[in-house]
UniProtKB/Swiss-Prot annotation:
UniProt organism field: Aeromonas hydrophila subsp. hydrophila (strain ATCC 7966 / DSM 30187 / BCRC 13018 / CCUG 14551 / JCM 1027 / KCTC 2358 / NCIMB 9240 / NCTC 8049)
Location(s), subcellular: Cytoplasm
EC assignment: 2.7.4.25
GO cellular component: cytosol
Name listed for the protein in its UniProt record: Cytidylate kinase
Gene Ontology BP terms: nucleobase-containing small molecule interconversion; pyrimidine nucleotide metabolic process
Pfam families listed in its UniProt record: Cytidylate_kin
Similarity remark: Belongs to the cytidylate kinase family. Type 1 subfamily.
């Protein structure tokens, strides 16, 4: 039986810096990228476009099963493509983000997207960005990272990110939404947000992205041996 491509899972709460880290890792290693959170955001956007109620699990399941999503990594950004359309900017609004968190709590919706996510595991390797990548989707992954940061720091990062993209946002409201989302994600019955038992926990509150990248690459070398880099 051929050896499966290695997987590095990067889990953690919203705003911890997972997206930036995963993009840098995918570029550095030349590996494929799976943005699990984006898949849920794409599904949420599809639901909003098709007027599917966010609490209608039975209607969301077939929508999830037939979701056509791709991630195109280049030197500057990761493009999220839904049925041929670049929805990278649209899915990053707070409305879509909150909708994604709600639909992710449905067990049958998560199951419908599970197989699609696992299909991203292809040579030479996969960087899997999410909240339950190391605990549920790829429990056998060779490298597991749990990237964390304080709620205040994550709100500040998100505030700056949205402002830079031209969105009008309120910091206090953003902080409240992050805390509420944390509570939902950490306490949901299915796949709650928590580090895998064999994950390296990295608190990025006082770290630069470069420091986080060096830490993660060093750990990957320990777990995998010599990883080829671009």
């Amino acid at each position: 039986m051929p050896q499966m491509a290695p997987v590095m899972t990067i889990d953690g709460p919203s705003g911890a810096g997972k997206g930036t880290l995963c993009q840098l890792l995918a570029e550095k290693l030349g590996w494929h990228l799976l943005d699990s959170g984006a898949i849920y955001r794409v599904l949420a956007l599809a639901a909003l476009h098709h007027d599917v109620e966010l609490d209608a699990e039975a209607a969301l399941v077939p929508l999830a099963a037939n979701l056509d999503v791709q991630f195109q990594v280049d030197a500057e950004q990761v493009k999220v493509v839904l049925e041929g359309e670049d929805v990278s900017r649209t899915i990053r609004t707070e409305e879509v983000g909150n909708a994604a968190s709600k639909i992710a709590a449905f067990p049958r919706v998560r199951e419908a997207l599970l197989r699609r996510q696992r299909a991203f595991r292809q040579a030479p390797g996969l960087i899997a960005d999410g909240r339950d990548m190391g605990t549920v989707v790829f429990p056998e992954a060779e490298v597991k990272i749990f990237l964390d940061a304080s709620a205040e720091e994550r709100a500040a990062r998100r505030y700056k990110q949205l402002q830079d993209k031209g969105f009008d946002v309120n910091f206090e409201r953003l902080l409240t939404e992050i805390r509420e989302r944390d509570d939902r994600d950490r306490n949901r019955a299915v796949a709650p947000l928590k580090p895998a038992e064999d994950a390296l926990v990295v608190d990025s509150t006082a770290m630069s992205i470069d420091e986080v990248l060096v830490t993660v690459l060093a750990y990957a070398e320990q777990q995998l041996g010599d990883v080829s880099t671009n």
